[in-house]
Amino acid sequence: MAEYTRSISFYGREIDINIGLMAPQAGCGVWLTSGETSVLVTATRQAGRAGVDFLPLLVDYEERLYAAGRIPGGYLRREGRPPERATLISRLIDRPLRPLFPEWLRDDVQIVATTLSVDDKVPPDVLCILGASLAIHSARIPFNGPVAAVRVGLVKDEFIINPTYAEIEAGDLDLVVAGCADGVIMVEAGANQLPEKDVVEAIEFGFEAVQELLKAQQQVFADLNITPVELPPPPQNEELVAFVAEHAQEEIRSVLRQFLDKTSREQQLEAIKAKLEAQIQARPEGDPLRLYLLENPKELDNQFKALTKKLMRQQILQEGVRVDGRKLDEVRPVSCRVGLIPRVHGSALFNRGLTQVLSITTLGTPGDAQELDDLHPVDEKRYMHHYNFPGFSVGEVRPSRSPGRREIGHGALAERALVPVLPKEEEFPYVVRVVSEVLSSNGSTSMASVCGSTLSLMDAGVPIKAPVSGVAMGLIKEGDEVRILTDIQGIEDFLGDMDFKVAGTRAGITALQMDMKITGITVDVVEKALLQAKAGRDYILDKMLEVLPAPRPQLAKTAPRLLTFKVDPEDIGKIIGPGGKMVRSITEATGAKVDISDDGTITVSSSVGGQAEAARAMIENLVRRVEEGQVYLGKVTRIIPIGAFVEFLPGKEGMIHISQLAEYRVSRVEDEIAVADEVVVKVRSIDHKGRVNLTRLGISPEEAARVRNHHP
């Protein structure tokens, strides 16, 4: 492809598009630059593999630290496993693209977005979505796009398109909206307890901005004479379709109307499918349908699922009844328990239907904060939420692996939902980690993790501003007929058109994530879903607060105790000491852990009472300004003919002249004191070089008793 360039003016910024300069052997390489943020997005298609019955789409976002002028740490000095943020951006790019590919496409498709440079203003993620849409079309891959995305911020009650990092940090909303010609196709947001109406306005504002990027892409395609590539659906075996409908339709409908639990329903559906398979196998060897299934063994399963999907959707659309008997806006039974696990700092077990999540809270010190080594300006996290999804939670046998993209994404969503209600560091200096263990899954485990996290934090005594609950909303849409479902279970997620996760407090929304399986919905449908979700969230929150109405007034006995105080930043070196000698000695002497910030904030933690106070006293003694007349308890370190040296503060010595050892005349210093003796001394004078002269004279019994009693 010949090199093509174009520049788009978009909300006060230029977006420079270059197609064809880079990655000539990829299907297409698109290089986009906005400000000093630059990304390369490639799209490549490869002939499908035999036996694949799904779209093998792979989306990878690659961060290179050279983009920020940095060299990676570690022995190898190169990037290793993608950081969590890269995984989240990969998912963010994937989610608006996937619904727009023909569902029958079986070719391998890979999108790779590489950040080449970043500035401190333009986040690369939404730029990558634009680049992916351009690359897919330019590579002549079947795709029902174009698609584009924008970020919407809210600063001082004003919506901003594609805000800078600073504006995102200062604002109350961080919303990404993706859309295509048919409507909104993806939403992801974190918000500071925003009312539903404000969020809807933000989505509408963002969707209007998306239209400009869609028009710009159409102009690019017109310039390059690129037309959409059509991929007609593969022909169906009409005999198989008719056979499945004739022999299974009424039985499937009967199962769906029995309002069974997940396990019973799946067992009965599997029995119906097995009977179909047996009927076909009983046919003569030369029977066309039997031969067809020998060549296409997955087609019976595909047609059975398609019929089940059709009947479930008909039941919801025509009768307003779901497969478990619930109304469209009804939440499954909710139950909660807290404080189940001994020794941990906080725990909660949250049940909603057959979905069960155990959330456990751990409180740590500032030194336990997670250091982030990526291209984002934020370099550490004080709150971490980790989500685990073992095979047994869905009755499967599979080996345990490191967290996959789904687990990372669900964990991050639940984390985002709680961040707006966490106390400020000045009020609660602990680093907090919550782990949500999915013990049973039948839909919406991420929102169950939000509810479990809230209760676990409250059980741990974390003074959150308000409790947060979450619910997943679904959608069934056929033509103009639309039904919104509250608290979807697994089958409704799998066979439905939308998974819209909404989390928030009574005051407003804290996190959103909407994924579509169809090519977009209107903002009106989004608004209805949010309002219906509000009722569901409030119902769940009521159930949670029946168990634990407020954070516990005290931390768990096993939680570390923290003391926080400030010192002059110039004194930090004294506290650390050469090679960390002094701070290590404090830890060894007291058993407390010491964390030091660059601004002079000292946090001392201990699990045993008195340790933190002892460490604080030692630190305060280290940085205390020595003044004449102050009285100390010191230790004799060495003796010379004319006197003795006494360490009266850690690392600080002064000399007692022989004439200041006693009220009477002392002939030999050794006759009065010895090395390692503890002595009460007073600062007599400090000379121009900072040398301290001490005395044992003129100290009252009360002063001596005071320093002995308060010495750590």
Swiss-Prot record:
Residue span, S1 motif domain: 629-697
Major localization listed first in the record, in broad terms: cytoplasm
Entry keyword annotation includes Transmembrane: no
Domain called KH: residue spans: 560-619
Cofactors named for this entry: Mg(2+)
Any one Gene Ontology BP term: mRNA catabolic process
Protein name: Polyribonucleotide nucleotidyltransferase
Organism of provenance: Synechococcus sp. (strain JA-3-3Ab)
